[in-house]
Amino acid sequence: MEEEKMAENKIKTIGVLTSGGDAPGMNAAIRAVVRRGLSNGLNVKGILKGYNGLLNEEIIDMSAKDVSDTIERGGTILYTARCAEFRTEEGQKRGAEICRKHGIDGLVVIGGDGSFAGAQKLANLGINTIGLPGTIDLDIACTEYTIGFDTAVNTAMEAIDKVRDTSTSHERCSIIEVMGRGAGYIALWCGIANGAEDVLVPEKYDYDEQKLINNIIESRKKGKKHHIIINAEGIGHSEAMAKRIEAATGIETRATILGHMQRGGSPTCKDRVYASMMGALAVDLLIAGKTCRVVGYRHGEFVDFDINEALAMQKGISDYQWEVCQSLSHNYDNCLLYTSPSPRDLSTS
């Protein structure tokens, strides 16, 4: 009797979708889900354009050939979108009904916290779901790694190196704005990797513009030919900041906003391998009868967490990481450890 029940509940068809912002390595994860599923005798369906495509029934059969020569490509072959309708109870119920209509027993959702919230709703409606952390921001608390972060931070690092070259040639001050609306990990890592003089992140927002101006002036007095400031998107207003700094110091100051280039490009080895491992584990979890789980990476191991727990966790830059970043800057004796207005106040000229 128990064997009959297990046979009835056995996963036969799985789906995979990418949701929210794209991230390098998503294709590696998709490839792993498809091939791991097929190797276990499952049917695999790709859902185009995230939850939006699910509600529009843009669902295709996936073969091993469909994911050939994709591991090295940036973006997502399944496309992605944000879907306001899926935030409603009606949209969520319809999504679950469409999964059943197409025989999808389990669903792998690749995205960030918002995507996981959608997966959680589907799980509550009886659809087995597993989430994979796909975001360049590294802002998911249950994991030390997110798909796309490694590529994005390397893209930003290489771009900042190039800005430094021209900044030195012209003896400029340069503000480079990197992605990270609510999380400053790209800014923090680039601050250390690029040897920036100053780093501004939303988690450790202790910005004092006069102190920053003083740092630039003191740096110039000491013979420094450039001054690199890395500014997270969550603080923003780099153009306005550059104008004020130039007016106050007399030093030519330029703002460079890296923008969406950080989302693109061929994924690094780490993003390809880690995304592949996560994709394979997601399929294994579905086969094992698990649902409402998020795959993560902690302490050298690929692990899984309950989605509810994962969404409840809080993540932030540690005081130690921030202190190291500050102490290694060329202005370590003038660290920006002061309080000032909120990030939005920087928009004033």
Q: Where in the sequence are the language-model features?
A:
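N-terminal phosphate-binding or glycine-rich loops at protein starts, especially the Walker A/P-loop
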Residues: N9-L55
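Short Gly/Thr/Asp-enriched flexible loops that form oxyanion-binding sites at enzyme active sites
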Residues: A29-V33, G114-I127, A187
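Glycine-rich oxoanion-binding loops at beta->alpha junctions
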Residues: L55-L107, I147-N154, E158
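Accessory alpha-helical/coil subdomains and C-terminal extensions
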Residues: V109-G111, K121, F149-E252, T256
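Short, acidic/small-residue loops that bind anionic groups at enzyme active sites
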Residues: A123-T146, L200-K204, I257
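C-terminal non-catalytic interaction/assembly regions of soluble proteins
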Residues: H237, I245-S340
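Single conserved hydrophobic/aromatic residue that forms the stacking wall/gate
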Residues: Y338-S349
